[in-house]
Amino acid sequence: MSSADVITLPKLLSKVPEIFGNLPGLIKGSKMSKITDTNTPLGLGVAFEKATDSNPNGVAILYEDRELTYKQFNAWANRIADYLASIGLKKGDTVAVDVENRPELLATVLGCAKLGVCSALINTSQKGKVLTHSFNLVEPKAAIIGQELVEVIQEVRDDLDLKQNFFYFADQDTLADPGTAPEGFTNLATEIKDCSSENPASTHQTFLRDPLFYIYTS
């Protein structure tokens, strides 16, 4: 893929967002980066579940006035994974993600990772034809759009190859208040409320060379 870089676990180890703080399973990057066994389950989902088991009540997310423990954040990601699985997404699929840097973005990436679904992290500054190209390039099976990016997506909606499965996250604490999705979008925060918060078995079906997310370069 000429304009997207695949990020797998070894590359991720040096790129963990600061918002995750001290994630025990990933801090040991020097050890994990030496793993060569392609049959050993590992990945962001595996690492986060291990961190949750060892420190469930520790603070995983600090963002503005929001604070989430490992247990809370893991459960949130599990509900996202459960819902995406319920609509047919599976390992090897791609989801386009156009959300600014906030907890909803991280929960989405982690939820997708637990399914083996690759998150295509759309550059939030893109518009028009550039946005259309980036979006269509990865052939997503679904799209998760933040309220802050709905307008620019709507401007190119007719040019996008994806015609269904457009999901929405309000630009607020969606765990406290899911907000209301605009026409043409499904409110993901509402849909996941009754989904399972248990760790999915699919987490342990991701391996060393499975992609985690796409990032876009010029």
Indicate where each model-derived feature is located.
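Conserved AMP-binding/adenylate-forming core of the ANL superfamily
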Residues: 36-44, 57-102, 106-110, 127-135, ...
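Flexible, non-catalytic linker and terminal segments flanking ANL/adenylate-forming cores
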Residues: 1-41
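Structural core segment of the AMP-binding/adenylate-forming
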Residues: 2-15, 86-87, 114-191
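Conserved pre-ATP/AMP-binding loop-to-beta segment of ANL
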Residues: 56, 167-170, 183, 193-216
